Amino acid sequence: MPRSVNHVASRARRKKILGLTKGYFGARKNVWTVAKNTWEKGLTYAYRDRKNKKRNFRALWIQRINAAARLEGMSYSKLMGALHKAGIEINRKVLADLAMNHPEAFKAIVAKAKAA
C-alpha cells in the first residue's frame, strides 16, 4: 500500500506561516525554514517583552514620581513612605499621571502626605 501523505494540510500550514512572515526582509519572508525560525523567534521575543513591558513602565512611573517629588522637596522613597503612613492608597501609575498632567493635584497629595 502506498504511503499516505496529507499534502493539503502541509501546504496550508506552510502558507499560514509564510503569510505571517509577510513583510519580513530577504529570505525571512519566502524560504520556509528561515521564515518558520524567524516567526518562532518573534513569538519568543513577544513573550519576553510582554513581561519586560511591566518592568519598564513601573520604572518609568517611579522616575516621574521621583522627579515631581523632588520639586516638592521630597525623595521618592520618603514620599511613598509618607503616603503609606497617611493612608493614601494610590498606585504608581495614577501618581505618575498626576505628576505629569495635573501638577496641582500632585502637590495637594504631597502636602497631605507631608502633614501626616
Curated annotation (Swiss-Prot):
**Keywords, in A-Z order:** Ribonucleoprotein, Ribosomal protein, RNA-binding, rRNA-binding
Per the UniProt record, one Pfam family is: Ribosomal_L20
Biological process (GO) annotations held by this record are:
ribosomal large subunit assembly; translation
**Top-level division of the source organism's lineage:** Bacteria
Q: Name one GO cellular component term.
A: ribonucleoprotein complex
Instruction: State one molecular function term (GO).
Output: structural constituent of ribosome
Family that this chain belongs to: Belongs to the bacterial ribosomal protein bL20 family.
Task performed by this protein:
Binds directly to 23S ribosomal RNA and is necessary for the in vitro assembly process of the 50S ribosomal subunit. It is not involved in the protein synthesizing functions of that subunit.
What name is this protein filed under?
Large ribosomal subunit protein bL20
Q: Which gene encodes it?
A: rplT
